[in-house]
């Protein structure tokens, strides 16, 4: 029986500066760390870290997600980051705090959540 070919991990040349993109929706959180030109260095989501269902949108899930992405980028040599947050989800602050605890120096924090100029009609209010 033939064995599957072993995939080599792509070697990434990382500078010390980078950008952390945090996308916090109502259902999930995704953290992507790129270099200044936009090439992905590491990424992580709440589902990738073992959270399922409604637990994916908790501050603890965002903390674990940001820590795992930051640890991988730190091991590759990244030290200073700019943070860009998008979305209304909970755990935005916890993600930034865990980036700092992982050893990355946060230079700037900017909120790039897209705001409609009276665009689409929002979903109706829930009645539970």
Curated annotation (Swiss-Prot):
Transmembrane segments: none annotated. This is Small ribosomal subunit protein uS11. Part of the 30S ribosomal subunit. Interacts with proteins S7 and S18. Binds to IF-3. Coiled coil: none annotated. Located on the platform of the 30S subunit, it bridges several disparate RNA helices of the 16S rRNA. Forms part of the Shine-Dalgarno cleft in the 70S ribosome. GO terms for molecular function: rRNA binding; structural constituent of ribosome. It comes from Chloroherpeton thalassium (strain ATCC 35110 / GB-78). GO terms for cellular component: ribonucleoprotein complex; ribosome. Belongs to the universal ribosomal protein uS11 family. One of its GO terms (biological process) is translation. The keyword Ribonucleoprotein applies. The keyword Nuclease does not apply. Pfam families: Ribosomal_S11 (PF00411). Keywords: Ribonucleoprotein, Ribosomal protein, RNA-binding, rRNA-binding. SUPFAM superfamilies: Translational machinery components. Gene3D superfamilies: Ribosomal protein S11 (3.30.420.80).
């Amino acid at each position: 029986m033939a064995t599957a070919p072993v995939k080599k991990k792509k070697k990434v040349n990382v500078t010390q500066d980078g950008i952390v993109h945090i996308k916090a929706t109502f259902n999930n959180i995704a953290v992507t760390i790129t270099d200044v030109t936009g090439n992905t260095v590491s990424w992580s989501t709440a589902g990738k870290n073992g959270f399922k269902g409604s637990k994916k949108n908790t501050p603890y899930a965002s903390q674990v997600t940001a820590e795992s992405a930051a640890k991988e980028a730190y091991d590759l040599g990244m030290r200073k980051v700019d943070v860009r947050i998008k979305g209304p989800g909970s755990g935005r602050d916890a993600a930034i705090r865990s980036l700092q605890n992982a050893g990355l120096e946060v230079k700037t924090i900017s909120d790039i959540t897209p705001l409609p100029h009276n665009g689409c009609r929002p979903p109706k209010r829930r009645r539970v």
